[in-house]
């Protein structure tokens, strides 16, 4: 399997620089690693992982049934095949505001 050269921290720095450029960014959605690779090869600026599309791909309606593990695992599989920054829809944050201390570090490792 193809792994990328850039670590998540470098991808975040790159994305921050793109945001500061004040240019319109093109960020299509990817629901699997192959789509993410194609997005990078075509020349887009980043990859978006949709919570709704991910839920549907797992066989769930988009009503908050995916877990943090579902989202972090799928997002990791997608982000590891591209040097582009990956924006992940973490839906409702999984459970409550007090759960944020687990959600954010988990997703930031993606």
Q: What are these language model-derived features?
A:
Residues 32, 39, 89:
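Conserved, mostly hydrophobic/aromatic
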Residues 26-29, 47-49, 86-90:
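Hydrophobic faces of well-ordered beta-strands that scaffold small-molecule active sites
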Residues 1-29, 38:
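N-terminal amphipathic alpha-helix/helix-capping segment at the start of soluble metabolic enzymes
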Residues 48-70, 92-96:
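Glycine-rich, proline-tolerant flexible connector loops at the mouths of alpha/beta enzymes
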């Amino acid at each position: 399997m193809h792994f990328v050269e850039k670590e998540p921290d470098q991808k975040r720095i790159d994305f921050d620089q793109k945001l500061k450029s004040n240019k319109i960014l093109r960020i299509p959605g990817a629901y699997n690693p192959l789509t993410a690779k194609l997005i990078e090869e075509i020349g887009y600026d980043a990859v978006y992982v949709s919570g709704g599309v991910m839920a549907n791909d797992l066989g769930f309606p988009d009503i908050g049934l995916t877990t943090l593990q579902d989202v972090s695992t799928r997002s990791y599989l997608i982000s590891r095949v591209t040097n582009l920054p990956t924006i992940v829809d973490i839906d409702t944050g999984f459970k409550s505001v007090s759960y944020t201390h687990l959600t954010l570090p988990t997703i930031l490792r993606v």
